[in-house]
A protein has these predicted regions:
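Bacterial N-terminal signal peptides that target proteins for export
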Residues: 1-8
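C-terminal motif of bacterial Sec signal peptides marking the signal peptidase cleavage site
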Residues: 15-18
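Acidic, serine/threonine-rich low-complexity disordered tracts
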Residues: 20-76, 81-174
């Protein structure tokens, strides 16, 4: 009986040894699913909002350009205006705005928090760059601006994004 038991245990060990996944096999298998690291430095921007500063990365989405980072900051820019702001070092911060004719409506959630009058965008040449500016205001006047480089890429966005007239500045780093 012990001889039979030894035989079956030996047979079981031989069968199981064929099922061992070696580390090189596992590494090759996991290597198939890993994507190579992506260098985002070409799409990096600095964002400043009140006393908060961070680095964000630009990604093209159907609605425009989304600037975001691992901290949860999100800024949606439609090509002319910053439309949504989330995060910015503040838990629960979330603004969005819409334009209708010459009015910009600022919202927090579903609640309307301010309506500002905004003029049409004006273009000016400024040392080999184009500066687009927009006069806006309600109780106080302010200017939104976009600076465009010679190659047509946006270099700087400066816009008021909330009812407290807090400006956000996005600056291209590379």
């Amino acid at each position: 009986m012990t001889l039979t038991r030894i035989f079956y245990c030996g047979l079981l060990l031989v069968i199981l040894s064929g099922c061992v996944v070696q580390s090189s096999q596992l590494s090759a298998l996991t290597g198939l699913f890993k994507s190579p690291p992506v260098d985002l430095s070409a799409n990096s921007w600095s964002v400043r909002y009140a006393d908060y500063e961070a680095i964000v990365y630009a990604v093209t989405v159907p609605e425009g350009t989304l600037f975001s980072n691992k901290a949860g900051d999100q800024i949606l820019f439609d090509g002319w205006s910053i439309r949504q702001v989330k995060g910015m070092g503040r838990r629960g911060l979330g603004y969005h705005n819409t334009d209708n004719s010459n009015q910009r409506t600022f919202m927090r959630g579903n609640r309307k928090i301010a309506i500002h009058s905004c003029m049409a965008w004006q273009q000016q040449e400024q040392s080999s760059m184009k500066r687009f500016s927009q006069q806006c205001g309600d109780r106080e006047p302010y200017v939104n601006s976009i600076l465009v480089a010679k190659d047509g890429s946006i270099a700087l966005i400066h816009q008021v994004v909330d009812d407290r007239y807090t400006a956000m500045t996005l600056t291209k780093l590379n």
